[in-house]
Every structure is written in C-alpha cells, then in structure tokens.
C-alpha cells in the first residue's frame, strides 16, 4: 500500500488551509497513494480561539475535505475542530474517501508541558478503526502517542496501520521524543505507524506557548524501523508499506499474543 504524509504549516484561516489540503491530496494521489495523512489542527493552528472557527462534522470545511478526497480518489485524514455542547470543541480527525466517511475525537488531551488543552477541548471516548481496501487503519491524534494501550487496542480491533495526526509542541528534546514515541508505538502494536506533524513555524509565532509543530513526520514499520521521514519544513512524504509483513512481525515479537489482560481502555477523562 502506498501512503503519504502531508506535513503542512497551518495558518489561522480555514479556507487557506483547505487549499493546502487540496494541493497535497492531489499531489499524493498523482503519486499513487491510497491514503494521505494531514496533521492535527489542519483546519486552523493552535494559539487562537478555536470555538470561533469550529464547524460541525457536516459543515462546509468538512464537506470541502470530502469533495477534495472524492475528486482525487484518495482517502484523506485531516485534523479539524467541531463545536461541543459546553462551548468547548472536539479535536477531531475526519477520515474520508472512497468508501470511507467517519471521524475520530482525540481521547488523550494535552494537559502537559504548561499547556491545558482540556480548557478548550472535550475528550473523545472511542477508538476508531477504518477499513481501507481491506486494511484496518486506526486513527489517533498527537498526545495519544504517549499512551501505548490505545495503540494495542487499535491493533486488537484489527488495525495494521495506525495514523497519528499531530501538532507537536516544541522544546528541548521534543523532536527526539516524537520520533522515539512513534517507533515505540509501532513496536507496541506491531503495526505500521504513519505519523504526520505540522511543519516547524520557525520563529513566526514568538511568545506562543501553543503546540504548533516541529516537523519530523515519519513512517515506522512494525519492527520500529523508520521507513521514510521529513525534515522540519513543509513536505509531502510518499512511501510504500508492505501490509502483509504485519502478520510475520506479530508472530515474531508476539507482544499482542502474550499481552496481559490487565491493560485495558475503559474510559477517557479530562483532567481539566
């Protein structure tokens, strides 16, 4: 299966960001990719009031993504924000394309490193796996990557490829953590990991504590190998993954087969 990572740099205007989705999705499709993974906050970067730009999953921005995916003939996974009942939003990944139209709400909120996402975001409750040409694809978002039990649960539900849409916070050692965590989750779940971050804004947002990306998007194999990666600037990464190799990796490492049943996901709670 050929997949693509669209490492873009989102701005604050959803319509401009939608044009980026159209451009990168078309380019990914032209290179033969079946799936293109965009970052968290593709709709609008962090650091601005999100409730003001949030739209329903049936709204014009999401419909724009659906139209782009349909026209290009590719499945698109992209981060957006959806209004919640209490005035906050959900941090949502829309996944849409041929035979696919669903969404995932981020379960683990980024109440860490001095940022409190739960002030503005309501947590999701349910892991999501989509079917892409017979391949199970799990959907996750950014801070989720620090919680291995979600990834093993997605594998248990049939995922052989797990996407991570991120807007990673910058800081000392954070890029190394991002790369390490992606490879570790590949090993935990013995799945391919397609991890797409926002490109690094390179000092264009002085004084902002919001997580706005460090780049370093990558694809990791079920054995934790980095198969393809990006630098810090906007970039489209296209690579092939051998989905059939997942079974052999799971037989060899056997962490899913030998896993103790004490580790379960029962619920997700906001700490805000």
Predicted regions span which residues?
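Extreme N-terminal starter segment of soluble prokaryotic enzymes
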Residues: 1-4
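Active-site catalytic loop in hydrolytic enzyme cores
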Residues: 83-161, 170-180, 184, 251-255
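Cys-nucleophile CN-hydrolase/nitrilase-fold catalytic domain and related Cys-dependent amidase chemistry
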Residues: 14, 22-103, 169-184, 188-191
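Short polar catalytic/cofactor-binding loops
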Residues: 7-13
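Short beta->alpha transition motifs characteristic of CBS
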Residues: 44, 94, 104-110, 218, ...
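A conserved C-terminal secondary-structure "cap"
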Residues: 246-272
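Short beta-strand scaffold segments in enzyme catalytic cores
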Residues: 78-80, 91-95, 128-130, 217-219, ...
């Amino acid at each position: 299966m050929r997949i693509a990572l669209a490492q873009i740099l989102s701005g604050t205007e959803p319509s401009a960001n939608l044009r980026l989705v159209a451009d990168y999705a078309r380019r990914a499709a032209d290179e033969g990719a079946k799936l293109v993974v965009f970052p968290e906050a593709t709709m609008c970067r962090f650091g601005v009031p999100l409730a003001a730009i949030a739209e329903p999953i049936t709204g014009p921005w999401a419909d724009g993504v659906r139209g782009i995916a349909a026209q290009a003939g590719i499945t698109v996974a992209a981060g957006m924000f959806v209004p919640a009942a209490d005035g906050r939003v959900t941090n949502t990944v829309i996944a849409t394309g041929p035979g696919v139209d669903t969404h995932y709400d981020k379960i683990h909120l980024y109440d860490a490193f001095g940022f409190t996402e739960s002030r503005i975001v309501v947590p999701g409750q349910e892991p999501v796996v989509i079917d892409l040409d017979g391949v199970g694809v799990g959907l996750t978002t950014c801070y989720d990557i620090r919680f291995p039990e979600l990834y093993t649960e997605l594998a248990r539900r049939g995922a052989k490829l797990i996407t991570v849409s991120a807007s990673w916070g910058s800081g000392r050692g954070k890029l190394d953590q991002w790369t390490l965590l992606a490879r570790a989750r590949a090993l935990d779940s013995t799945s391919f990991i397609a991890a797409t971050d926002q490109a690094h804004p390179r000092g264009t947002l002085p004084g902002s504590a919001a997580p706005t990306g460090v780049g370093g998007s990558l694809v990791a194999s079920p054995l934790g190998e980095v198969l393809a990666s990006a630098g810090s600037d906007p970039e489209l990464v296209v690579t092939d993954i051998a989905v059939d190799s997942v079974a052999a990796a799971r037989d060899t490492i056997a962490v899913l087969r030998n896993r103790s049943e004490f580790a379960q996901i029962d619920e997700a709670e906001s700490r805000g």
